[in-house]
Amino acid sequence: MAATMAAQSLLSIPVEYRSQVWCRANLPYPPAPQLPIPAVVDILTKASQALPQISFSWTLIDQPPDGSLFLVWQAPTLPSPPDGMHFMSNERFFNMDVAGKVLEIHEAKHGFYPLSETRTMHVRCRYRLLGVGFDNFWLVHYFQGSETDSIPANISVAKPPHLRRYPLPDVKTSPFLLQEPKKHIPEGTALSQRETLPNMGSAQMKSQSRTPSFSNVTTSPVPPINSNATAQTAEGHMGATNMTVDNMNKPSIPPNGNTSILMQEDLEIEKGDVMDKLSPQQICTARFIKHAEWMSQVLLTLQSVKDIEPPALWQEPNSMEELGKELKDNKEQLVKQDQKYQSLQGDLSYTDSMSNLLKEFSNIKSAEECDVLQKKIEEFAEAKIVPLSHVTERS
């Protein structure tokens, strides 16, 4: 149910903004100008324990102020959605062992907002705990960088290279849960007895018989232990007292002599397997995460859908004649492209030579030198005439 609500909320957002939204937790963290590493581990640990009570929403993040702190869900294989900040350096990541836990840190320095800042002033750090089943949840922290590490901002070489389009719409979906809270199972049910049976002690078994109820199988209650009972009765009581899930497949012999043989197939059905430990909510959550990662890769690709050609089915291999003809056509096409490239390179070299001659005018000190240089330029211009078609093709 939780995964379905998250998917429906994402589909309610316009298509052009689905790759820009963050799955952010609705937790009002106070501003933190500085955040020590132990505090990061403590926040992520508490968030992993309280995950069934934390609601999330799809929303846009744009130019967060220094000290902002967010808990977000994001697949590790996908890049971070845009947040309005551009960086002059690549994001680096490293691991750190803190209190027996592995903390992965992604640090992006030299951040700036291109519409209002001319120097890099911000740092973004993303943290996540590894090996605790919380790998897709990140703590994102924005803070001010060091003044000595500030450099001039240049949007032409920054990452990401494209500016964000403004104004942005107010996108925020209804809150949803990524993991539903565990439901309380009333004591006395078959599932409750199955879970509590391995932890029962012999004292509890003596005071009250609590054998699980199997379908299509009848068992006799175990009477209380009597010190005057026969050896056979005492042996039957010990078998019932020390019964566990591992030896329940053995037939029990009650004291009255009535034997109930439990079939092996019924016992396997009753005990279940590994998949019985997964709730429908956990299965839906896993499917949603898998599909969300796949759809994010599809939406972020630069390949147009109409240009994707399906593979040919049952295509027979080409003959040697067809392969030879195809190879010949490819070679001719490569020759034409090489000739065109050489022609364009000649135009570029001519332009560079002309530019160098014109730059020599700045070093002229006499009229004689000016006349000599002017003569060189006229001779060079007459020797090389650029066709108009080349100019139009390049423009």
Curated annotation (Swiss-Prot):
Pfam families: SWI-SNF_Ssr4_C, SWI-SNF_Ssr4_N
GO cellular component, one term: cytosol
InterPro entries linked: Ssr4_N (IPR013859), SWI-SNF_Ssr4_C (IPR046464)
Signal peptide: none
Subunit: Component of the RSC complex composed of at least arp9, arp42, rsc1, rsc4, rsc7, rsc9, rsc58, sfh1, snf21, ssr1, ssr2, ssr3 and ssr4. The complex interacts with histone and histone variant components of centromeric chromatin. Component of the SWI/SNF global transcription activator complex composed of at least arp9, arp42, snf5, snf22, snf30, sbf59, sol1, ssr1, ssr2, ssr3, ssr4 and tfg3.
Similarity comment: family membership: Belongs to the SSR4 family.
Protein name: SWI/SNF and RSC complexes subunit ssr4
Gene: ssr4
